[in-house]
Amino acid sequence: MVFDTIAAISTFPGEAGIGIVRLSGDDALEIISKIFKPYKSKDIKKVKSHTLHYGHIVDPETEEVYDEVLVSIMEKPNTYTREDIVEINCHGGIVVTSKILELVLKQGARLAEPGEFTKRAFLNGRIDLSQAEAVIDIIRAKTMLANRYAQKQLVGYVGSKIKEMKDKIMGLLVHLLALIDFPEEDVEELERKEILETAKEIVEDIDKLIASSESGRIIREGLKTAIIGKPNVGKSSLLNALLKENRAIVTDIPGTTRDIIEEYVNVKGIPIKLIDTAGIRDTDELVEKIGVTKSKEVLAEADLILFVLDASRELTKEDYEIFDILTGKNIIFVLNKIDLPKKIDEKELKDLTKDGIIIEVSTVEKIGLEELENTIYNLVFRGDISLREDEIVINSRHKEALINAKKYMESCVEAIEGGYSEDLITIDLNAALDQLGKITGETATEDLINEIFERFCVGK
Protein backbone atom coordinates (compact mmCIF):
# COMPACT_ATOMS: atom_id res chain seq x y z
CA MET A 1 0.00 0.00 0.00
CA VAL A 2 1.49 3.37 -1.04
CA PHE A 3 1.06 6.49 1.08
CA ASP A 4 2.61 9.94 1.14
CA THR A 5 5.26 10.76 3.75
CA ILE A 6 3.99 12.00 7.09
CA ALA A 7 5.71 13.71 10.00
CA ALA A 8 4.88 14.76 13.55
CA ILE A 9 6.39 15.54 16.93
CA SER A 10 6.12 12.28 18.90
CA THR A 11 7.10 13.60 22.32
CA PHE A 12 5.38 15.86 24.84
CA PRO A 13 5.20 19.41 23.43
CA GLY A 14 6.95 21.21 26.27
CA GLU A 15 10.23 21.56 28.11
CA ALA A 16 12.05 18.22 28.15
CA GLY A 17 15.50 16.71 27.80
CA ILE A 18 14.76 15.15 24.42
CA GLY A 19 12.25 15.74 21.66
CA ILE A 20 11.51 13.40 18.75
CA VAL A 21 10.30 14.32 15.28
CA ARG A 22 9.15 11.22 13.41
CA LEU A 23 8.78 10.69 9.66
CA SER A 24 7.25 7.71 7.85
CA GLY A 25 6.93 7.06 4.13
CA ASP A 26 8.84 6.48 0.91
CA ASP A 27 10.37 9.97 0.92
CA ALA A 28 11.53 9.91 4.56
CA LEU A 29 15.18 9.21 3.66
CA GLU A 30 15.18 11.78 0.85
CA ILE A 31 13.79 14.46 3.16
CA ILE A 32 16.27 13.83 5.99
CA SER A 33 19.16 13.89 3.50
CA LYS A 34 18.27 17.49 2.61
CA ILE A 35 18.33 18.85 6.18
CA PHE A 36 20.73 16.60 8.11
CA LYS A 37 24.49 17.18 8.08
CA PRO A 38 26.03 14.05 9.61
CA TYR A 39 29.36 14.01 11.43
CA LYS A 40 32.10 12.72 9.07
CA SER A 41 30.19 13.46 5.89
CA LYS A 42 28.30 10.43 4.63
CA ASP A 43 25.31 9.73 2.43
CA ILE A 44 22.54 9.20 4.98
CA LYS A 45 20.44 7.46 2.30
CA LYS A 46 23.02 4.66 2.02
CA VAL A 47 23.69 3.87 5.67
CA LYS A 48 22.66 0.56 7.25
CA SER A 49 19.09 0.24 8.46
CA HIS A 50 18.35 0.52 12.16
CA THR A 51 21.38 2.67 12.90
CA LEU A 52 21.86 5.94 14.79
CA HIS A 53 23.80 8.92 13.40
CA TYR A 54 25.16 12.06 15.03
CA GLY A 55 25.05 15.45 13.30
CA HIS A 56 23.13 18.71 12.92
CA ILE A 57 19.82 19.78 11.43
CA VAL A 58 20.54 22.64 9.02
CA ASP A 59 18.18 24.81 6.97
CA PRO A 60 19.29 24.10 3.36
CA GLU A 61 18.29 27.60 2.23
CA THR A 62 19.93 29.72 4.96
CA GLU A 63 22.55 27.26 6.29
CA GLU A 64 21.28 28.06 9.80
CA VAL A 65 21.97 25.26 12.28
CA TYR A 66 18.75 24.36 14.11
CA ASP A 67 20.06 21.77 16.55
CA GLU A 68 22.59 19.07 17.38
CA VAL A 69 20.77 15.75 16.90
CA LEU A 70 20.87 11.98 16.67
CA VAL A 71 19.01 10.56 13.67
CA SER A 72 17.59 7.01 13.61
CA ILE A 73 17.29 5.38 10.19
CA MET A 74 14.89 2.42 9.91
CA GLU A 75 14.12 0.96 6.50
CA LYS A 76 10.97 -0.97 5.60
CA PRO A 77 9.56 -3.53 6.16
CA ASN A 78 10.94 -4.07 9.69
CA THR A 79 9.56 -0.87 11.17
CA TYR A 80 6.56 0.25 13.21
CA THR A 81 4.59 1.26 10.09
CA ARG A 82 6.28 -1.17 7.65
CA GLU A 83 7.45 1.97 5.82
CA ASP A 84 10.79 3.79 5.90
CA ILE A 85 10.97 5.62 9.23
CA VAL A 86 13.29 8.41 10.33
CA GLU A 87 13.35 9.73 13.88
CA ILE A 88 15.15 12.97 14.68
CA ASN A 89 16.20 12.99 18.35
CA CYS A 90 16.73 16.64 19.20
CA HIS A 91 16.72 18.75 22.35
CA GLY A 92 13.29 19.04 23.93
CA GLY A 93 11.25 22.21 24.01
CA ILE A 94 8.59 23.79 21.85
CA VAL A 95 10.88 25.99 19.74
CA VAL A 96 13.43 23.42 18.56
CA THR A 97 10.98 20.59 17.81
CA SER A 98 8.54 22.94 16.08
CA LYS A 99 11.24 24.47 13.88
CA ILE A 100 12.57 21.04 12.87
CA LEU A 101 9.05 19.82 12.07
CA GLU A 102 8.45 22.98 10.05
CA LEU A 103 11.64 22.29 8.09
CA VAL A 104 10.61 18.67 7.45
CA LEU A 105 7.19 19.75 6.17
CA LYS A 106 8.85 22.31 3.90
CA GLN A 107 10.80 19.47 2.25
CA GLY A 108 7.59 17.69 1.23
CA ALA A 109 6.25 15.75 4.22
CA ARG A 110 2.66 16.14 5.39
CA LEU A 111 1.64 16.73 9.00
CA ALA A 112 0.37 13.41 10.38
CA GLU A 113 -3.19 13.07 11.62
CA PRO A 114 -3.90 11.70 15.14
CA GLY A 115 -2.87 8.05 15.28
CA GLU A 116 -1.78 7.95 11.65
CA PHE A 117 1.50 6.12 12.31
CA THR A 118 -0.37 3.30 14.07
CA LYS A 119 -3.10 3.43 11.43
CA ARG A 120 -0.45 2.75 8.79
CA ALA A 121 0.85 -0.17 10.84
CA PHE A 122 -2.71 -1.57 10.69
CA LEU A 123 -3.32 -0.81 7.01
CA ASN A 124 0.06 -2.28 6.08
CA GLY A 125 -0.79 -5.51 7.93
CA ARG A 126 1.70 -5.35 10.79
CA ILE A 127 -1.00 -5.33 13.48
CA ASP A 128 -4.74 -6.00 13.62
CA LEU A 129 -7.32 -3.53 14.89
CA SER A 130 -7.44 -4.96 18.42
CA GLN A 131 -3.65 -4.57 18.66
CA ALA A 132 -3.94 -0.96 17.50
CA GLU A 133 -6.45 -0.31 20.29
CA ALA A 134 -3.98 -1.83 22.75
CA VAL A 135 -1.57 1.01 21.91
CA ILE A 136 -4.16 3.49 23.23
CA ASP A 137 -4.64 1.38 26.36
CA ILE A 138 -0.88 1.33 27.01
CA ILE A 139 -0.68 5.11 26.66
CA ARG A 140 -3.66 5.60 29.00
CA ALA A 141 -2.80 2.84 31.50
CA LYS A 142 -3.09 4.07 35.09
CA THR A 143 -1.37 1.07 36.71
CA MET A 144 1.07 -1.70 35.80
CA LEU A 145 -1.84 -4.17 35.86
CA ALA A 146 -3.63 -2.13 33.19
CA ASN A 147 -0.39 -1.98 31.23
CA ARG A 148 0.08 -5.76 31.58
CA TYR A 149 -3.33 -6.51 30.07
CA ALA A 150 -2.76 -3.98 27.28
CA GLN A 151 0.63 -5.54 26.50
CA LYS A 152 -1.06 -8.96 26.18
CA GLN A 153 -3.50 -7.48 23.69
CA LEU A 154 -0.68 -5.73 21.82
CA VAL A 155 1.14 -9.00 21.16
CA GLY A 156 -2.07 -10.46 19.76
CA TYR A 157 -3.82 -12.38 22.56
CA VAL A 158 -7.27 -11.05 21.65
CA GLY A 159 -6.60 -11.45 17.93
CA SER A 160 -5.43 -15.04 18.41
CA LYS A 161 -8.61 -15.94 20.33
CA ILE A 162 -10.73 -14.39 17.59
CA LYS A 163 -8.71 -16.26 14.95
CA GLU A 164 -9.32 -19.57 16.75
CA MET A 165 -13.08 -18.98 16.64
CA LYS A 166 -12.98 -17.82 13.03
CA ASP A 167 -11.00 -20.93 12.05
CA LYS A 168 -13.64 -23.12 13.70
CA ILE A 169 -16.41 -21.31 11.82
CA MET A 170 -14.50 -21.62 8.54
CA GLY A 171 -14.18 -25.35 9.25
CA LEU A 172 -17.96 -25.58 9.69
CA LEU A 173 -18.51 -23.75 6.41
CA VAL A 174 -16.22 -26.21 4.61
CA HIS A 175 -18.19 -29.15 6.05
CA LEU A 176 -21.52 -27.60 5.09
CA LEU A 177 -20.41 -26.81 1.55
CA ALA A 178 -19.24 -30.42 1.20
CA LEU A 179 -22.68 -31.63 2.32
CA ILE A 180 -24.33 -29.35 -0.23
CA ASP A 181 -22.10 -30.62 -3.06
CA PHE A 182 -22.02 -34.31 -2.02
CA PRO A 183 -25.21 -35.16 -0.12
CA GLU A 184 -25.24 -38.67 1.37
CA GLU A 185 -27.89 -39.41 3.96
CA ASP A 186 -25.76 -41.44 6.44
CA VAL A 187 -22.77 -39.14 6.20
CA GLU A 188 -24.96 -36.03 6.43
CA GLU A 189 -26.48 -37.08 9.77
CA LEU A 190 -23.05 -37.71 11.28
CA GLU A 191 -21.61 -34.47 9.88
CA ARG A 192 -24.52 -32.39 11.22
CA LYS A 193 -23.95 -33.81 14.73
CA GLU A 194 -20.29 -32.81 14.59
CA ILE A 195 -21.19 -29.38 13.23
CA LEU A 196 -23.71 -28.90 16.04
CA GLU A 197 -21.12 -29.77 18.71
CA THR A 198 -18.58 -27.36 17.25
CA ALA A 199 -21.18 -24.58 16.93
CA LYS A 200 -22.06 -24.98 20.62
CA GLU A 201 -18.35 -24.84 21.52
CA ILE A 202 -18.02 -21.56 19.65
CA VAL A 203 -20.96 -20.09 21.59
CA GLU A 204 -19.19 -21.07 24.83
CA ASP A 205 -15.92 -19.53 23.62
CA ILE A 206 -17.70 -16.27 22.79
CA ASP A 207 -19.41 -16.26 26.20
CA LYS A 208 -16.04 -16.50 27.97
CA LEU A 209 -14.73 -13.46 26.13
CA ILE A 210 -17.92 -11.46 26.72
CA ALA A 211 -17.62 -12.19 30.45
CA SER A 212 -14.25 -10.41 30.49
CA SER A 213 -15.69 -7.09 29.26
CA GLU A 214 -16.55 -5.92 32.78
CA SER A 215 -13.00 -6.71 33.87
CA GLY A 216 -11.74 -4.68 30.95
CA ARG A 217 -13.78 -1.68 32.02
CA ILE A 218 -12.40 -1.86 35.56
CA ILE A 219 -8.82 -2.12 34.31
CA ARG A 220 -9.18 0.74 31.84
CA GLU A 221 -11.44 3.13 33.75
CA GLY A 222 -10.72 2.09 37.32
CA LEU A 223 -12.87 0.40 39.97
CA LYS A 224 -15.56 3.00 40.65
CA THR A 225 -15.44 3.30 44.43
CA ALA A 226 -17.89 5.68 46.09
CA ILE A 227 -17.15 7.00 49.57
CA ILE A 228 -20.59 7.30 51.18
CA GLY A 229 -21.87 8.34 54.58
CA LYS A 230 -23.73 11.01 56.49
CA PRO A 231 -22.09 14.43 56.91
CA ASN A 232 -18.95 14.82 59.04
CA VAL A 233 -18.03 11.14 59.44
CA GLY A 234 -14.68 11.66 57.71
CA LYS A 235 -15.36 10.84 54.05
CA SER A 236 -13.08 13.57 52.71
CA SER A 237 -10.44 12.70 55.30
CA LEU A 238 -10.55 9.09 54.05
CA LEU A 239 -10.14 10.28 50.45
CA ASN A 240 -7.12 12.40 51.43
CA ALA A 241 -5.61 9.54 53.46
CA LEU A 242 -5.90 7.06 50.58
CA LEU A 243 -4.50 9.60 48.13
CA LYS A 244 -1.77 10.55 50.62
CA GLU A 245 -2.45 14.21 49.84
CA ASN A 246 -4.97 16.89 50.78
CA ARG A 247 -7.33 16.87 47.82
CA ALA A 248 -10.63 17.51 49.62
CA ILE A 249 -11.46 20.27 52.10
CA VAL A 250 -11.83 18.90 55.62
CA THR A 251 -13.66 20.82 58.39
CA ASP A 252 -15.81 20.06 61.42
CA ILE A 253 -18.76 21.69 59.69
CA PRO A 254 -21.27 19.10 58.38
CA GLY A 255 -22.02 19.45 54.67
CA THR A 256 -18.63 20.92 53.67
CA THR A 257 -18.38 18.72 50.57
CA ARG A 258 -21.03 20.00 48.16
CA ASP A 259 -19.79 18.48 44.91
CA ILE A 260 -18.40 15.18 43.69
CA ILE A 261 -14.60 14.82 43.84
CA GLU A 262 -12.99 12.10 41.69
CA GLU A 263 -9.37 10.95 41.99
CA TYR A 264 -7.41 7.84 41.00
CA VAL A 265 -5.29 5.82 43.40
CA ASN A 266 -3.21 2.73 42.69
CA VAL A 267 -4.08 -0.09 45.11
CA LYS A 268 -1.62 -2.94 44.51
CA GLY A 269 -1.84 -2.44 40.76
CA ILE A 270 -5.61 -1.98 40.56
CA PRO A 271 -6.71 1.48 39.39
CA ILE A 272 -9.25 2.70 41.93
CA LYS A 273 -11.44 5.64 40.96
CA LEU A 274 -12.26 7.17 44.34
CA ILE A 275 -15.40 9.29 44.38
CA ASP A 276 -15.89 11.50 47.43
CA THR A 277 -19.55 12.39 47.73
CA ALA A 278 -21.56 14.94 49.65
CA GLY A 279 -22.91 13.66 52.96
CA ILE A 280 -26.35 12.12 52.47
CA ARG A 281 -29.00 13.67 54.69
CA ASP A 282 -32.25 15.63 54.48
CA THR A 283 -31.44 19.29 53.95
CA ASP A 284 -33.19 22.48 52.87
CA GLU A 285 -29.97 24.18 51.77
CA LEU A 286 -30.15 24.29 47.94
CA VAL A 287 -26.47 23.69 47.05
CA GLU A 288 -26.09 20.88 49.59
CA LYS A 289 -29.34 19.35 48.33
CA ILE A 290 -27.91 19.19 44.78
CA GLY A 291 -24.79 17.53 46.19
CA VAL A 292 -26.89 14.90 47.96
CA THR A 293 -28.78 14.17 44.72
CA LYS A 294 -25.47 13.72 42.87
CA SER A 295 -24.27 11.36 45.62
CA LYS A 296 -27.28 9.12 45.09
CA GLU A 297 -26.62 9.09 41.32
CA VAL A 298 -23.02 8.00 41.95
CA LEU A 299 -24.28 5.08 44.03
CA ALA A 300 -26.12 3.62 41.05
CA GLU A 301 -22.92 3.38 38.97
CA ALA A 302 -20.42 2.41 41.70
CA ASP A 303 -18.65 -0.97 41.65
CA LEU A 304 -17.79 -0.71 45.33
CA ILE A 305 -19.10 1.34 48.26
CA LEU A 306 -16.97 2.50 51.18
CA PHE A 307 -19.72 3.23 53.73
CA VAL A 308 -18.08 5.46 56.33
CA LEU A 309 -19.39 5.38 59.92
CA ASP A 310 -18.23 7.44 62.91
CA ALA A 311 -16.98 5.25 65.78
CA SER A 312 -17.09 8.22 68.16
CA ARG A 313 -20.86 8.66 67.73
CA GLU A 314 -23.87 6.42 68.09
CA LEU A 315 -25.62 5.20 64.97
CA THR A 316 -28.43 7.47 63.80
CA LYS A 317 -31.50 7.26 61.65
CA GLU A 318 -29.42 8.75 58.79
CA ASP A 319 -27.00 5.79 58.87
CA TYR A 320 -29.86 3.30 58.54
CA GLU A 321 -31.51 5.30 55.75
CA ILE A 322 -28.26 5.34 53.78
CA PHE A 323 -27.81 1.58 54.25
CA ASP A 324 -31.32 0.99 52.89
CA ILE A 325 -30.38 2.53 49.54
CA LEU A 326 -27.24 0.37 49.23
CA THR A 327 -29.08 -2.92 48.69
CA GLY A 328 -27.30 -5.25 46.28
CA LYS A 329 -24.03 -3.31 46.32
CA ASN A 330 -20.52 -4.49 47.21
CA ILE A 331 -19.93 -2.71 50.52
CA ILE A 332 -17.00 -2.27 52.87
CA PHE A 333 -18.03 -0.64 56.15
CA VAL A 334 -15.30 1.79 57.20
CA LEU A 335 -15.47 2.54 60.93
CA ASN A 336 -13.59 5.84 61.16
CA LYS A 337 -12.27 7.88 64.12
CA ILE A 338 -11.20 4.88 66.21
CA ASP A 339 -8.54 7.13 67.76
CA LEU A 340 -11.40 8.79 69.71
CA PRO A 341 -13.40 7.21 72.56
CA LYS A 342 -15.70 4.62 70.97
CA LYS A 343 -19.42 5.38 71.42
CA ILE A 344 -20.91 3.30 68.62
CA ASP A 345 -22.94 0.33 69.90
CA GLU A 346 -21.34 -2.96 68.74
CA LYS A 347 -24.66 -4.84 68.63
CA GLU A 348 -26.35 -2.10 66.61
CA LEU A 349 -23.34 -2.02 64.29
CA LYS A 350 -23.60 -5.79 63.73
CA ASP A 351 -27.34 -5.47 63.05
CA LEU A 352 -26.70 -2.70 60.53
CA THR A 353 -23.83 -4.36 58.68
CA LYS A 354 -25.44 -7.82 58.65
CA ASP A 355 -22.06 -9.57 59.03
CA GLY A 356 -20.55 -7.43 56.27
CA ILE A 357 -16.88 -6.46 56.08
CA ILE A 358 -15.92 -3.88 58.72
CA ILE A 359 -12.53 -2.16 58.66
CA GLU A 360 -11.59 0.07 61.59
CA VAL A 361 -9.53 3.11 60.64
CA SER A 362 -8.27 6.41 61.89
CA THR A 363 -7.57 8.84 59.07
CA VAL A 364 -5.84 11.14 61.58
CA GLU A 365 -3.46 8.49 62.98
CA LYS A 366 -3.26 6.61 59.64
CA ILE A 367 -4.47 3.39 61.28
CA GLY A 368 -6.17 0.62 59.26
CA LEU A 369 -5.57 2.14 55.81
CA GLU A 370 -3.32 -0.70 54.64
CA GLU A 371 -5.90 -3.25 55.83
CA LEU A 372 -8.56 -1.36 53.87
CA GLU A 373 -6.43 -1.44 50.70
CA ASN A 374 -5.77 -5.18 51.16
CA THR A 375 -9.50 -5.79 51.59
CA ILE A 376 -10.30 -3.94 48.36
CA TYR A 377 -7.62 -5.95 46.52
CA ASN A 378 -8.90 -9.28 47.90
CA LEU A 379 -12.50 -8.41 47.02
CA VAL A 380 -11.47 -7.87 43.42
CA PHE A 381 -9.32 -10.95 42.93
CA ARG A 382 -11.39 -13.50 44.82
CA GLY A 383 -14.24 -12.80 42.43
CA ASP A 384 -16.63 -10.66 44.49
CA ILE A 385 -15.89 -8.02 41.90
CA SER A 386 -15.17 -9.43 38.44
CA LEU A 387 -11.44 -9.48 37.70
CA ARG A 388 -8.92 -12.27 37.25
CA GLU A 389 -5.23 -11.70 36.80
CA ASP A 390 -4.88 -14.40 34.14
CA GLU A 391 -7.72 -13.48 31.81
CA ILE A 392 -7.83 -11.67 28.48
CA VAL A 393 -9.92 -8.52 28.66
CA ILE A 394 -11.90 -6.85 25.90
CA ASN A 395 -13.36 -3.40 25.40
CA SER A 396 -16.94 -2.30 24.78
CA ARG A 397 -16.51 -2.35 20.98
CA HIS A 398 -15.29 -5.93 21.09
CA LYS A 399 -18.17 -6.84 23.40
CA GLU A 400 -20.78 -5.49 20.99
CA ALA A 401 -19.33 -7.47 18.09
CA LEU A 402 -19.11 -10.64 20.22
CA ILE A 403 -22.73 -10.30 21.37
CA ASN A 404 -23.80 -10.06 17.72
CA ALA A 405 -21.59 -13.01 16.75
CA LYS A 406 -23.08 -15.06 19.58
CA LYS A 407 -26.59 -14.22 18.38
CA TYR A 408 -25.79 -15.57 14.91
CA MET A 409 -24.10 -18.69 16.30
CA GLU A 410 -27.12 -19.42 18.53
CA SER A 411 -29.32 -19.01 15.47
CA CYS A 412 -27.02 -21.46 13.69
CA VAL A 413 -27.43 -24.01 16.52
CA GLU A 414 -31.22 -23.65 16.35
CA ALA A 415 -31.15 -24.11 12.57
CA ILE A 416 -29.09 -27.31 12.82
CA GLU A 417 -31.32 -28.71 15.58
CA GLY A 418 -34.40 -27.74 13.57
CA GLY A 419 -33.18 -29.60 10.51
CA TYR A 420 -32.92 -26.51 8.31
CA SER A 421 -30.99 -26.64 5.05
CA GLU A 422 -27.22 -26.19 4.88
CA ASP A 423 -27.69 -23.02 2.80
CA LEU A 424 -29.60 -21.31 5.62
CA ILE A 425 -27.06 -22.41 8.24
CA THR A 426 -24.18 -20.91 6.23
CA ILE A 427 -25.92 -17.51 6.28
CA ASP A 428 -25.67 -17.37 10.09
CA LEU A 429 -22.07 -18.61 10.04
CA ASN A 430 -21.00 -15.96 7.54
CA ALA A 431 -22.75 -13.27 9.61
CA ALA A 432 -20.89 -14.45 12.73
CA LEU A 433 -17.60 -14.33 10.80
CA ASP A 434 -18.36 -10.77 9.74
CA GLN A 435 -18.90 -9.69 13.36
CA LEU A 436 -15.67 -11.32 14.56
CA GLY A 437 -13.83 -9.67 11.67
CA LYS A 438 -14.87 -6.26 13.01
CA ILE A 439 -12.79 -6.89 16.13
CA THR A 440 -9.56 -7.56 14.26
CA GLY A 441 -10.38 -5.20 11.41
CA GLU A 442 -10.93 -7.41 8.36
CA THR A 443 -14.58 -6.39 8.06
CA ALA A 444 -14.48 -3.06 9.91
CA THR A 445 -15.89 -0.09 8.00
CA GLU A 446 -13.72 2.88 7.06
CA ASP A 447 -15.75 5.10 9.42
CA LEU A 448 -15.10 2.73 12.34
CA ILE A 449 -11.38 2.57 11.57
CA ASN A 450 -11.16 6.37 11.39
CA GLU A 451 -13.10 6.73 14.64
CA ILE A 452 -10.67 4.43 16.47
CA PHE A 453 -7.53 6.18 15.26
CA GLU A 454 -8.93 9.64 15.99
CA ARG A 455 -8.62 8.75 19.70
CA PHE A 456 -4.83 8.71 19.39
CA CYS A 457 -2.53 11.64 19.94
CA VAL A 458 -0.63 13.15 17.01
CA GLY A 459 2.74 11.45 16.57
CA LYS A 460 1.64 7.94 17.55
From Swiss-Prot:
It comes from Thermoanaerobacter sp. (strain X514). Residues 222-381 form the TrmE-type G domain. InterPro entries: G_TrmE, GTP-bd, GTP-bd_TrmE_N, GTPase_MnmE, MnmE_dom2, MnmE_helical, P-loop_NTPase, Small_GTP-bd. Mg(2+) binds at S236, T257. Belongs to the TRAFAC class TrmE-Era-EngA-EngB-Septin-like GTPase superfamily. TrmE GTPase family. One of its GO terms (molecular function) is metal ion binding. Binds 1 potassium ion per subunit. Pfam families: MMR_HSR1, MnmE_helical, TrmE_N. Keywords: Cytoplasm, GTP-binding, Hydrolase, Magnesium, Metal-binding, Nucleotide-binding, Potassium, tRNA processing. This is tRNA modification GTPase MnmE. Its EC number is 3.6.-.-.
